[in-house]
Structures are given as structure tokens and as C-alpha cells.
A protein has these predicted regions:
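Conserved beta-strand hairpin/beta-sheet module of binuclear metal-dependent hydrolase folds
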Residues: 1-17, 77-89
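Active-site metal-binding motif and surrounding structural segment of the metallo-beta-lactamase
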Residues: 6-49
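Metallo-beta-lactamase
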Residues: 73-149
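Residue-level signal for the nucleotide or nucleotide-sugar donor/cofactor binding architecture
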Residues: 33, 63, 103-104
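Binuclear metal-dependent hydrolase catalytic cores
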Residues: 43-45, 50, 55-57, 134, ...
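Active-site neighborhood of phospho(di)ester-bond hydrolases with catalytic His/Asp-centered motifs
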Residues: 2-4, 20-28, 47-49, 67-70, ...
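Short secondary-structure boundary/capping segments
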Residues: 13, 36, 54-57, 77, ...
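Core dinuclear metal-dependent hydrolase active-site scaffold
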Residues: 55-80, 86
Length: 149
């Protein structure tokens, strides 16, 4: 599970597999609200920027952690290469980027944008809110936002 923000009972009821881990892209309330309930229900370990390495295996999943501070100091993006998907929390949205005024930093955001732009355009991005997109679809937006800082 990635970023269980709330409604723990709905999350638990909708999952038909064993949960072995919970990944947090950043520690804002709307991404961590259901952690304790889900962690306790499944006896799952919680993973975040503090205890993940660059390359990770949790259960059957293999993924890369990419530090993407800017929206918050602890923001990470989680890239599943085999599936060509990246979970980006509130770092990037479809058509926009995350706010930097909630414990973030504009220069960190600029560096994080530059990091993500080094990845392949075909990677599907799943933000913490709203619709998914791809790096290619966001490239012009991200280049524009990067120049603002």
C-alpha cells in the first residue's frame, strides 16, 4: 500500500491480498492518516525515506526510491521499473507540481524536477491526488516550472 491517507476500513475491505508493507511518499496528514490502523491490521512494516534504500524488495515487489524533495523535505518517488510506473506523492500532478510552502523548498523542487526529467517519457506517474499522467505528457510543464525557481 502506498500513502494510505484515510478511511482505513475501506482500504482494508478492498484488498484481497496479504499486505506486507506500507510505503509513505511523504509525511503530510493526507498521506499517513490510515497508517496505524492498516499497520496493526496486517502487521505490516512502514517504509519511508528514512528506512528505504535506493533499490528495494518488499514481498514480490522490486522498486527504486528516488529522493524528490521540494513539496516536503522527506518526499520520495517510488519507481517500479518492471511496470513502468512511478508513484510521486504530491511532487508532480497532472498539469502541475506540488506546493513548496508546506515544509518544502523551491530549489529542492527544481532539482527534483530535473531528476525526474532524466527518466523515460513513457513512465506513467501516479500522483497522490487526481489523474495519472506520464513524464512525456508533463515534460513541457515540468520544464516551465523548473525555470520559475
Amino acid at each position: 500500500i502506498i500513502d494510505p491517507g484515510g478511511e482505513a476500513n475501506k482500504i482494508i475491505e478492498s484488498i484481497a491480498v496479504e499486505v506486507v508493507g506500507i510505503i509513505i511518499t511523504h509525511h503530510h496528514f493526507d498521506h499517513v492518516g490510515a497508517i496505524e490502523s492498516i499497520k496493526n491490521y496486517y502487521n505490516a512494516k512502514v517504509y519511508d525515506y528514512g528506512n528505504l534504500k535506493e533499490e528495494n524488495n518488499i514481498g514480490v515487489f522490486t522498486f527504486r526510491v528516488i529522493p524528490t524533495p521540494g513539496h516536503s523535505d522527506d518526499s520520495i518517488s517510488v519507481y517500479f521499473k518492471d511496470d513502468n510506473v512511478m508513484f510521486v506523492g504530491d511532487f508532480v500532478f497532472n498539469g502541475s507540481i506540488g506546493r513548496t510552502d508546506l515544509g518544502g523548498n523551491e530549489m529542492d523542487m527544481k532539482k527534483s524536477i530535473e531528476t525526474i526529467l532524466s527518466y523515460d517519457d513513457s513512465i506513467r506517474l501516479y500522483p497522490g491526488h487526481y489523474l495519472s499522467t506520464t513524464i512525456g505528457d508533463e515534460r513541457k510543464n515540468l520544464e516551465y516550472f523548473s525555470k520559475m525557481f
